[in-house]
């Protein structure tokens, strides 16, 4: 199995400032940890290609791109807010992140590798004409559009970020060739306020938008139960040619911006589940990205190092010690192992519905909304 990372130090310049949660240390700490654990030695590493404005324009409007290039606050385009402050070189680095995800897609689609990742990407909130939720350009959507434009028949997109993947869903809402699947904290409590089960796709694409809105406090067992009750079934019905996934790790219980209760072990289990679906359904063709995640030291580097290891084809065992040199770099509170000590087990939904469970209610709501559109019985 061949795995590839698209990366250069230029991608770490995506930086909204020292007090912003989208800290570049999320990526630099991950690269350092992955290097010290030998994970980078098992991956091909290539830099992003030169910026291609025409590629950006397959998703984003020319006037919006021009506004980003000017680098000035502009409320019409969402630029200059507290979430999305303008910073020097914003257009260039956001475009490089986008080129990196498109290059990952190209490498997989042309058969150079089976698996490719861009941990700097996953900017799933960006809309065609405005910045949103720390996301300037929607690299995931550009990568998916590139696949479609280059002969890919169907794309499956799985988003495990705690926030709904609203930008990707909106962009492909009327596109039956793209199935977007998002598991997130309920929008009744959390940004961006979308991602209800009733959002199932536009006319002619019904059943290709799949939303699992989980209650605050959902655990590993809850999340994995929901994933396996829905995601394999809908993807098998869609029959994707390539699987694209976004791996925001802000579902972790220590993340400061959300309210789910997953462990690192549960997140690792989710990455393995996505990889297995790519192997089952797409002959291994899998393009992955990073995403959210704001516990910059204790969670993100370990989570994404696990992702990189899985992309390489050689997963890291959870009991693996964190290298002492990395812990010294990180400081006194650095974790000791690549695990939170959780079992990451779950009871399959098929073993029985629990009426009083808010998680089971969320699962059933999604199955009832989507399964009939795909010719499946939600009760089975």
Predicted regions and their residues:
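N-terminal low-complexity, Ser/Thr- and acidic-residue-enriched intrinsically disordered segments
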Residues: 1-57
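A general "terminal functional-core" signal
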Residues: 2-6, 12, 67-380
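Charged, often glycine-rich, active-site loop that binds/positions anionic groups
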Residues: 49-73
